[in-house]
């Protein structure tokens, strides 16, 4: 019987949970705003972790400024992660902005716009046929 989840997937899920707790409770930085961890990808040797995050930016905050602030805390976060998870080697954590939500909304808006234009054209074509 094959395994449903590989070790890297299990470690990835656990890292996501622990990082969310660390960011919520331990990291105090007003520049961050609200951070959501959307995914964690761990290398096969468990030495590196790519953490994909999204931000709820308030005021003058931009995703780039929030990401820069978060990257300043990478070493501290890795140290706290090492205390929470028992692994031979604590993965080196790198944060990346996940723009899939923004792109998905943009694509949805484009589709809605095209559908609305198509409905208007159909109504106009229907009126011309009646005349």
From Swiss-Prot:
SUPFAM superfamilies to which the protein is assigned, alphabetical: Ribosome-binding factor A, RbfA
Keywords, alphabetical: Cytoplasm, Ribosome biogenesis
Main location: cytoplasm
Protein's UniProt keywords contain Protease: no
GO molecular function terms noted in the UniProt entry: ribosomal small subunit binding
PROSITE patterns named among the record's database cross-references: RBFA
UniProt entry tagged with the keyword Metal-binding: no
Domain of life: Bacteria
Location within or outside the cell: Cytoplasm
A GO biological-process term: maturation of SSU-rRNA
Pfam families (alphabetical): RBFA
GO cellular component: cytosol
The protein's role, per its UniProt record: One of several proteins that assist in the late maturation steps of the functional core of the 30S ribosomal subunit. Associates with free 30S ribosomal subunits (but not with 30S subunits that are part of 70S ribosomes or polysomes). Required for efficient processing of 16S rRNA. May interact with the 5'-terminal helix region of 16S rRNA.
Subunit architecture: Monomer. Binds 30S ribosomal subunits, but not 50S ribosomal subunits or 70S ribosomes.
Homology family: Belongs to the RbfA family.
Name of the featured protein: Ribosome-binding factor A
Species of the source: Vibrio vulnificus (strain YJ016)
Lineage: Bacteria, Pseudomonadati, Pseudomonadota, Gammaproteobacteria, Vibrionales
Gene, per the UniProt record: rbfA
